[in-house]
């Protein structure tokens, strides 16, 4: 079995109850092409959690997962570009995000061993 690792990323939503409800509605029916692209990239599991307007995404990836390769593949897929454009109206990068970065990688500060 391929070794995996967990990554956590954060993002804010526009602080508007109607937009947040619409964002959640879209995520109850993520397009099959989007799910397929996620899996092709080496992401085995993904969860998105929300409190207020803050999102945390937890992903389980293969050890050789390459975020840059995923971004390149996503940019070449018209359906994923369409999904990302749709989601962009809801999302706000964190102040700590690098220029052009949407989901900001989080640093693990504790692990119960």
What function would you assign to each model-found segment?
Residues 13-15, 63:
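Beta-strand elements of well-folded, non-transmembrane domains
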Residues 35-56, 60-64:
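Short, glycine- and small/hydrophobic-rich beta-strand elements in well-ordered beta-sheets
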Residues 1-2:
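Ligand/cofactor pocket segment of small-molecule handling proteins
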Residues 104-110:
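Eukaryote-biased recognition of C-terminal alpha-helical segments
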């Amino acid at each position: 079995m391929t070794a995996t690792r967990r990554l956590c990323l954060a993002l804010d939503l526009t602080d508007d109850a109607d937009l947040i409800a619409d964002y959640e509605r879209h995520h109850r029916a993520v397009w099959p092409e989007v799910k397929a692209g996620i899996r092709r990239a080496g992401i085995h599991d993904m969860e998105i959690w929300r409190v207020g307007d803050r999102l945390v995404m937890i992903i389980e990836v293969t050890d050789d997962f390459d975020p840059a390769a995923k971004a390149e593949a996503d940019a070449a897929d018209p359906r994923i570009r369409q999904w990302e454009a749709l989601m962009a109206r809801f999302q706000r990068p964190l102040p700590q995000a690098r220029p052009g970065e949407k989901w900001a990688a989080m640093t693990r500060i504790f692990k119960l061993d």
